[in-house]
């Protein structure tokens, strides 16, 4: 994981869904050999180890994540079911990722996200907005999966054009870095540039798919999408 490698810290990752509750996060009793035994959740593990707690896709959560309020204030948490107070060890940090910054998705691009409680959001003091990587950085990412530098350059230029067109309102969809990785991996399988792109953009509607293909034609004259 990039966060772990960059910080050289242990990272405890929790994938948040609408079903995530206090039992999933803080912990609860489990049946072990006929007895009920308390089992710490990932949040308590991170607290006690002084690790980085990563709440991934936190805007998919319900109001059940409000059980984290005191932890986000740096005060630790009282485990009322077993009568124990857990203080955060030195270095404990909470990071959350969210596609909508906790404001929900009005355009429907991130269906399932929710508007999070304002008091909950206020407990995150710093927000970083992560744009797409520059073409140079994106090329380095793709180079981990593909050796064709020429193809990588064309893909990065293509994605950059699509994103600028999207921002200008010319198209309704965008190509992510993850989608580019899918494409170069498909290229390693098929050995065909056009087929790799087509198979990986077929999840979009036909109009968007054709628009993407036409935009790629502008950066790579050697590729044809004709059947």
Per-segment meaning from a language model:
Residues 1-227:
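C-terminal regulatory/interaction module of P-loop NTP-utilizing enzymes
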């Amino acid at each position: 994981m990039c966060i772990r490698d960059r910080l050289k810290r242990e990272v405890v990752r929790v994938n948040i869904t609408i079903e995530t509750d206090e039992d999933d996060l803080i912990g609860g009793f489990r049946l072990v050999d006929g007895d009920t035994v308390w089992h710490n959740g990932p949040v308590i593990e991170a607290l006690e180890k002084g690790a980085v707690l990563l709440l991934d896709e936190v805007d998919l959560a319900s109001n059940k994540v409000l059980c984290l309020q005191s932890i986000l204030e740096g005060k630790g948490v009282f485990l009322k079911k077993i009568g124990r107070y857990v203080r955060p060890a030195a270095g404990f940090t909470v990071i959350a990722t969210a596609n909508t910054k906790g404001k929900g998705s009005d355009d429907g691009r991130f269906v399932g996200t929710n508007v999070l409680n304002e008091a909950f959001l206020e407990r995150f003091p710093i927000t970083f907005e992560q744009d797409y990587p520059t073409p140079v950085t994106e090329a380095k990412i793709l180079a981990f999966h593909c050796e064709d530098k020429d193809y990588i350059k064309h893909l990065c230029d293509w994605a950059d054009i699509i994103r600028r067109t999207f921002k200008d309102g010319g198209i309704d969809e965008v190509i992510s870095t993850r989608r580019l990785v899918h494409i170069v991996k498909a290229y390693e399988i098929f050995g065909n540039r056009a087929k790799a792109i087509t198979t990986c953009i077929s999840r979009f509607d036909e109009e968007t798919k054709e628009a993407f293909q036409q935009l790629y034609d502008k950066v790579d004259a050697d590729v044809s999408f004709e059947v």
